[in-house]
From Swiss-Prot:
It comes from the Bacteria. One of its GO terms (molecular function) is ATP binding. Its main location: cytoplasm. Belongs to the ClpX chaperone family. HslU subfamily. Induction: By heat shock. Keywords: ATP-binding, Chaperone, Cytoplasm, Nucleotide-binding, Stress response. The gene is hslU. It is found in: Cytoplasm. GO terms for cellular component: HslUV protease complex. This is ATP-dependent protease ATPase subunit HslU. ATP binds at I18, G60, V61, G62, K63, T64, E65, D256, E321, R393. CDD domains: RecA-like_HslU. The keyword Chaperone applies. A double ring-shaped homohexamer of HslV is capped on each side by a ring-shaped HslU homohexamer. The assembly of the HslU/HslV complex is dependent on binding of ATP.
Length: 443
């Protein structure tokens, strides 16, 4: 679990997301409160429930990007889902309980990686011994059994030194490795994923753990043996319990497009993929117990962050019970021309940096001037205003159009320097931006 302070979390988010300070502060405080809760005594800790967040803002302003970056910072079980993928219980489609099952699967994977990393040093030692046994087979007694030697032989020590120094990396050896489990692919209707995964695990375990001889270079064999030995050192039952604890205490669920499941107008009959989904989400957000293949998971202390553009619907269109369970409201602002300029230059891997790196692979040096970046930002903002406002995503469309000619001819431009200034941008984009019909279909 992350021990970063809210200020550190916001600082880290600032490297990738421009503006939206209120949203960053809210998620940073929510993440820090997870850590604060774990410092309390057990009785009080049980009473402190997370304050779920509802992020409201137009498309392309950074809602989903905040979730993506938060997943990397949290160091906790995290899952992002689309609200539109679910239907009410009893109808064809995914049930909302599958959110917790997927979160638990993600936690098991995360905890397994951590456990393997923790045991890596011991696994490397065991893998080393297995390779040395192939290079220098141990002496055998009269019954054909390997004898236990008190001290490793001088030859074994010499080979161990060479192995650690990488002198034997390209030598080929034959070694027994665990055979890959039998691959069984089962297609099932939506909502029955749990059953298919259980059937797959049954079929895969039918053959037992078989060893298969393989010829490999020592450096490749070492990697596979380390993974195999590390997996043996991990206790599967402990791992499952640790994963369930991590989900219950630190789990975070990000539900995107929640505005798409708001009821629109007066409709008759059941609304299985809108209001029905909201009703099914209630027990998860409030706190219930969900059955997963790894065990029972309580959702009382899982943090839920919901987001939506709410361009057609309003937050008040959500059913009142769900509104009450999302007490923290954060409004993200539409992006301005100056925001677009900052998006093009400030993030660690901004779009302009990506294009420069891509063209550099062909030996073409691209330089974006300040005037060029300003003109690109103005063009993107202008197209957003005259057509659909898709936020920062418009920059990708505009830049792709701007760079099309260079990208196409890059292999013939090796060694050239190209400067993209205001004049270059105007020459390639002005006609499209000015013609509303063209920009509607091309940009």
């Amino acid at each position: 679990m992350s021990e970063m302070t809210p200020r550190e979390i916001v600082s880290e988010l600032n490297k990738h997301i421009i503006g939206q300070d209120n949203a960053k502060r809210s998620v940073a405080i929510a993440l820090r409160n997870r850590w604060r809760r774990m410092q309390l005594d057990e009785e009080l800790r049980h009473e402190v429930t997370p304050k779920n967040i509802l992020m409201i803002g137009p498309t392309g302003v950074g809602k989903t990007e905040i979730a993506r970056r938060l997943a990397k910072l949290a160091n906790a079980p995290f899952i992002k889902v689309e609200a539109t993928k679910f239907t009410e219980v009893g109808y064809v489609g995914k049930e909302v309980d599958s959110i917790i099952r997927d979160l638990t699967d993600a936690a098991v994977k995360m905890v397994r990686v951590q456990a393997i990393e923790k045991n890596r040093y011991r696994a490397e030692e065991l893998a080393e011994e297995r390779i040395l046994d192939v290079l220098i087979p141990p002496a055998k007694n009269n019954w054909g059994q390997a004898e236990q030697q008190q001290e490793p032989s001088a030859a074994r020590q010499t080979f161990r030194k060479k192995l650690r120094e990488g002198q034997l990396d390209d030598k080929e050896i034959e070694i027994n490795l665990a055979a890959a489990p039998m691959g069984v692919e089962i297609m099932a209707p939506p909502g029955m994923e749990e059953m298919t995964s259980q059937l797959q695990s049954i079929f895969q375990n039918l053959g037992g753990q078989k060893q298969k001889p393989r010829k490999l270079k020592i450096k490749d064999a070492m990697k596979l043996l380390v993974e195999e030995e590390a997996a043996k050192l991990v206790n599967p039952e402990e791992l499952k319990q640790d994963a369930i604890d991590a989900v219950e205490q630190h789990g975070i669920v990000f539900i995107d497009e929640i505005d798409k499941i708001c009821k629109r107008g007066e409709t008759s009959g059941p609304d299985v993929s809108r209001e029905g989904v909201q009703r099914d989400l209630l027990p998860l957000v409030e706190g219930c117990t969900v059955s997963t293949k790894h065990g029972m998971v309580k959702t009382d202390h899982i943090l839920f962050i919901a987001s939506g553009a709410f361009q057609v619907a309003k937050p008040s269109d959500l059913i009142p019970e769900l509104q009450g369970r999302l007490p923290i409201r954060v409004e993200l602002q539409a992006l301005t021309t100056s925001d677009f300029e900052r998006i093009l230059t400030e993030p660690n891997a901004s779009v302009t940096v990506q294009y420069k790196a891509l063209m550099a692979t062909e030996g073409v040096n691209i330089e974006f001037t300040d005037s060029g970046i300003k003109r690109i930002a103005e063009a993107a903002w202008q197209v957003n205003e005259t057509t659909e406002n898709i936020g920062a995503r418009r920059l990708h469309t505009v830049l792709e159009r701007l760079m099309e000619e260079i990208s196409y001819n890059a292999s013939d431009l090796h060694g050239q320097n190209i400067t993209i200034d205001a004049e270059y941008v105007s020459k390639h984009l002005d006609a499209l931006v000015a013609d509303e019909d063209l920009s509607r279909f091309i940009l």
